[in-house]
Amino acid sequence: MAVSWRSWLANEGVKHLCLFIWLSMNVLLFWKTFLLYNQGPEYHYLHQMLGLGLCLSRASASVLNLNCSLILLPMCRTLLAYLRGSQKVPSRRTRRLLDKSRTFHITCGVTICIFSGVHVAAHLVNALNFSVNYSEDFVELNAARYRDEDPRKLLFTTVPGLTGVCMVVVLFLMITASTYAIRVSNYDIFWYTHNLFFVFYMLLTLHVSGGLLKYQTNLDTHPPGCISLNRTSSQNISLPEYFSEHFHEPFPEGFSKPEEFTQNTFVKICMEEPRFQANFPQTWLWISGPLCLYCAERLYRYIRSNKPVTIISVISHPSDVMEIRMVKENFKARPGQYITLHCPSVSALENHPFTLTMCPTETKATFGVHLKIVGDWTERFRDLLLPPSSQDSEILPFIQSRNYPKLYIDGPFGSPFEESLNYEVSLCVAGGIGVTPFASILNTLLDDWKPYKLRRLYFIWVCRDIQSFRWFADLLCMLHNKFWQENRPDYVNIQLYLSQTDGIQKIIGEKYHALNSRLFIGRPRWKLLFDEIAKYNRGKTVGVFCCGPNSLSKTLHKLSNQINSYGTRFEYNKESFS
């Protein structure tokens, strides 16, 4: 099927434009710095000593400076949530670009890893060249103390060398702990190692303070490559006759007077010895702004989250899912947002993100989250909240005398699903536990749907286990009945796809009778579904929202970009829970 350029531009255009701008900045900065150290007269003698290693080390350092500053901006999540919710970003296309913050953070991280490798390799060559090409003429320019000094001493006895080695170790730990396998199997390792970025930035500011690389300051009196008369006489070097010949005044008419340091048209004579000075550290100029912004946000988030919530109830659902309902004074959130949970009794430092499945409203202050019990943290958290005897039961009623552990929340933070209520037509597709981001949206519609732009919602939930359906079966039934009573049966189109057939009638036949006709066995036929939605919403823009496995996401993303004969445009939005 052909790609719709209209849909492609809506889904990919701004993203690729920003990627092009970012790439251009990196290429321009790399090339400009490379040329400066390769051809700049102030680095003439240093380039003679170090060669290509100097150019590559400095060019890669400039790219590292840029990306070490940019990588912090996507992590200012409170700022991004404010921009999304305020009128500062009125364009929906621009707001959707904020959803790529995590991808941009990863892209900058990968770039830092690649150019760190280039930077390290170039400086290893520089350390060798400092030793081999020790300059007897310009001793001030040397980093080595004598010719053929062991290059390893430069790596482990100088500030730039030692901090560089430490940064490589920190970066290696952060890279390996950021892989998908470790994030899923042991999130604790990812969390602890990622917080080493504070150490990384401290080392980075120290790294540039060593002053090993120097530039020439007196280019006007000592042009690079000039001949020093003092050096030639002290070394018993005689200049050729035409070198020692002086111009006589007055100069012939039509000829300009040569520069003071010029003796003839063939050679320039130095007026003084070259003077060198260490480069002014520029890294702090790059990172100070974003780092201060991030630290200010972390401080604000710490103050905002230092008061524990009040747990109202804990509900145990089938398939290892737990629901927590709580209240907190002055807490406000929008449907689709998420929060982070911090329980000191489980871990003193760990915070874990969970999508809000119930948001506070004007009439009720209760909000809640659903947790899938996967990993050490959620298992320990469940054991604290639920006694072993009640973990298999459906509901644990709230008991006033029960002592729950202290629980702190941070947020709310923005997500792509906030836009689902801003389309006239939205298609929400969930895979398994990926249904949680849509629960708050469904709860909001159940409370009051009229203030929002949304007029038709297609809700598709693909699940392997019939027990998982019970997480939100009551909510779906109430929503279905509400719109039938208000004579709006076409407002919400619910389709549930389950692969397990055993016991379906037993579980949903009586209690959830309204959903019987909404239940299908197998997987959705996505192409037919998109064609049907396009047909019934001709010429409209449909927001597509997906939270589930990557295979599901890729399928919907591809279909959203394909052309259709009804003039319908699909704008794709994705949330990942891994």
Curated annotation (Swiss-Prot):
It is a multi-pass membrane protein. Its cofactor is heme. It holds the Pfam family Ferric_reduct. It catalyses: NADPH + 2 O2 = 2 superoxide + NADP(+) + H(+); NADPH + O2 + H(+) = H2O2 + NADP(+). N-glycosylation is required for the function. It is an enzyme of class 1 (oxidoreductase). Residues 248-575 are annotated as: Mediates interaction with TLR4. Residues 58-303 form the Ferric oxidoreductase domain. Keywords: Cell junction, Cell membrane, Cytoplasm, Disulfide bond, Endoplasmic reticulum, Glycoprotein, Membrane, NADP, Nucleus, Oxidoreductase, Transmembrane, Transmembrane helix. Glycans are attached at residues 133, 230. Its EC number is 1.6.3.1. One of its GO terms (cellular component) is endoplasmic reticulum. Residues 1-16, 84-103, 176-188, 446-578 are cytoplasmic. CDD domains: NOX_Duox_like_FAD_NADP. Residues 38-62, 125-154, 210-424 are extracellular. The chain crosses the membrane at residues 17-37, 63-83, 104-124, 155-175, 189-209, 425-445. Residues 304-419 form the FAD-binding FR-type domain. It is found in: Cytoplasm; Endoplasmic reticulum membrane; Cell membrane; Cell junction, Focal adhesion. GO terms for biological process: bone resorption; cardiac muscle cell differentiation; cell morphogenesis; cellular response to glucose stimulus; defense response; gene expression; heart process; homocysteine metabolic process. PANTHER family: NADPH OXIDASE (PTHR11972), NADPH OXIDASE 4 (PTHR11972:SF206). Interacts with, relocalizes and stabilizes CYBA/p22phox. Interacts with TLR4. Interacts with protein disulfide isomerase. Interacts with PPP1R15A. Interacts with LRRC8A; this interaction prevents the ubiquitin-mediated degradation of LRRC8A. NADPH oxidase that catalyzes predominantly the reduction of oxygen to H2O2. Can also catalyze to a smaller extent, the reduction of oxygen to superoxide. May function as an oxygen sensor regulating the KCNK3/TASK-1 potassium channel and HIF1A activity. May regulate insulin signaling cascade. May play a role in apoptosis, bone resorption and lipolysaccharide-mediated activation of NFKB. May produce superoxide in the nucleus and play a role in regulating gene expression upon cell stimulation. This is NADPH oxidase 4. It comes from Pongo abelii.
